């Protein structure tokens, strides 16, 4: 066993390169969060003065943060989880019984299916429009919910909509979704992994029953951390306390929330989320600027021969997927095959596209300066021209 490999683990990507990986752009730490990371990096560092519940700790101000975060989101109750997937899991575990059905969009993240499976439920999908836009047909939630009820005699246990999907970056109609669910009497969960911390969600009306988000994907926090927000009426059911009692010891923990396994995220992740929170509150006000940069990025990328943006047009979110047949043709004859594009970009100071992928690529310029976005575009243009692709 060679232990030396662990003695100097470093990561130079953010210092040396512009990172356009969509899952990382919203999780870049603020200077305040980096400082907090050093202060609270030791294990149970937030538990110096804990009276039994992590979300009630007042120093650091975790209890106050839960209240402020709920206000920021326009929801009633919040818990910090180890990621959006664990927030979904908590809701499904509380609401679903063996054999129940969860209705979800056909662009839902794989963790929606895994969480449902773990809860003993199955998933019925709502279709999308297919190539090239892949827009979720939100109106179809009503039909699918009715079909489930007709087949089973009971409505679905839960309906879930991915606010912005991780494949094409489409912004779905959350308010229409919630209205349909209200009318059908089905709890509505909005997966905001790519919108919470980027966009202002406080004005959604009507509110979903549940909203989940990602701290490390969208709130400038280190992993693993996420958010479960809910309307007050669900607090008792989803955040129920433990009811078991030890038959020998007689011990019981009625204040420990079952779906949270008593306590959730402690230490560096929650503290970095808190430290970045003032910045996040301000940056959601600049969302239109992020959309402007994204649309310019798309326009410049589509100057390259064959490049075509997939998903809804014009873009309303920073996550972009492109068809890149020209780069794919180059890759077929290149000694490095699909890795050539990643390597050519890295030589020009840009990383973040999936290594080996040239048929389609995903990227985000969220949080970059105009000059950095121009650098990214210039890198793609130079590579295209070097390999004989026309740039108009």
Curated annotation (Swiss-Prot):
Protein's GO biological process: translation
Specify one Pfam family: SepSecS
Q: Which reaction does it catalyse?
A: O-phospho-L-seryl-tRNA(Cys) + hydrogen sulfide + H(+) = L-cysteinyl-tRNA(Cys) + phosphate
Which positions does UniProt annotate for pyridoxal 5'-phosphate binding?
84-85, 191, 214-216
**Keywords in alphabetical order:** Protein biosynthesis, Pyridoxal phosphate, Transferase
Question: Please, which domain of life does this record's source organism belong to?
Answer: Archaea
Q: Which cofactor does it need?
A: pyridoxal 5'-phosphate
Which cysteine residues pair off into disulfide bonds?
none
Locate the N6-(pyridoxal phosphate)lysine modifications and list their residues.
Answer: 217
A molecular function (GO) term: Sep-tRNA:Cys-tRNA synthase activity
Give the EC number.
2.5.1.73
Family recorded in the similarity comment: Belongs to the SepCysS family.
What does the record note on quaternary structure? Homodimer. Interacts with SepRS.
> Tell me, what does this protein do in biology?
Converts O-phospho-L-seryl-tRNA(Cys) (Sep-tRNA(Cys)) to L-cysteinyl-tRNA(Cys) (Cys-tRNA(Cys)).
UniProt xrefs under PANTHER family: CYSTEINE DESULFURASE, O-PHOSPHO-L-SERYL-TRNA:CYS-TRNA SYNTHASE
The molecule here is called O-phospho-L-seryl-tRNA:Cys-tRNA synthase
């Amino acid at each position: 066993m060679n232990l030396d490999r662990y003695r100097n683990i470093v990561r130079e990507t953010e210092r040396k390169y512009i990172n356009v990986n969509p899952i990382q752009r919203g999780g870049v730490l603020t200077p305040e969060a980096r400082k907090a990371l050093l202060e609270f990096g030791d294990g149970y560092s937030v538990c110096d003065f804990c009276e039994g519940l992590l979300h009630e700790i007042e120093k650091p101000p975790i209890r106050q943060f839960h209240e402020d975060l709920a206000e920021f989101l326009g929801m009633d109750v919040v818990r910090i989880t180890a990621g959006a997937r664990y927030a979904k899991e908590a809701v499904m575990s509380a609401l679903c019984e063996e054999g129940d059905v969860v209705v979800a969009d056909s662009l839902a993240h794989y963790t929606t299916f895994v969480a449902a499976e773990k809860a003993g439920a199955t998933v019925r999908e709502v279709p999308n429009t297919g190539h090239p836009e892949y827009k979720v047909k939100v109106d179809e939630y009503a039909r699918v919910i009715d079909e489930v009820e007709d087949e089973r005699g009971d409505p679905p246990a839960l309906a879930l909509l991915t606010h912005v999907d991780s494949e094409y970056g489409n912004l779905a109609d959350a308010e229409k979704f919630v209205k349909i669910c209200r009318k059908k009497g089905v709890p509505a969960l909005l997966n905001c992994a790519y919108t919470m911390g980027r966009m202002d969600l406080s004005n959604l009306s009507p509110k979903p029953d549940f909203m989940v988000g990602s701290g490390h994907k969208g709130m400038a926090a280190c992993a693993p951390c996420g958010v479960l927000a809910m309307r007050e009426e669900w607090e008792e059911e989803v955040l129920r306390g433990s009811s078991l009692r030890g038959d020998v010891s007689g011990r019981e923990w009625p204040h420990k929330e079952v779906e949270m396994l008593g306590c959730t995220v402690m230490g560096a992740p929650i503290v970095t989320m808190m430290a970045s929170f003032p910045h996040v509150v301000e940056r959601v006000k600049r969302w239109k600027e992020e959309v402007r940069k994204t649309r310019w990025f798309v326009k410049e990328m589509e100057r390259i021969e064959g490049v075509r943006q997939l998903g809804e047009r014009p873009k309303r979110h920073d996550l972009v997927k492109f068809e890149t047949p020209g780069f794919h043709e180059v890759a077929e004859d290149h000694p490095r095959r699909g890795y050539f594009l990643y390597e050519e970009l890295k030589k020009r100071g840009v990383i973040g596209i999936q290594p080996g992928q040239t048929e389609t690529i995903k990227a985000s310029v969220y949080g970059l300066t105009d000059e950095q976005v121009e650098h990214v575009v210039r890198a793609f243009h130079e590579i295209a021209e070097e390999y004989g692709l026309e740039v108009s």
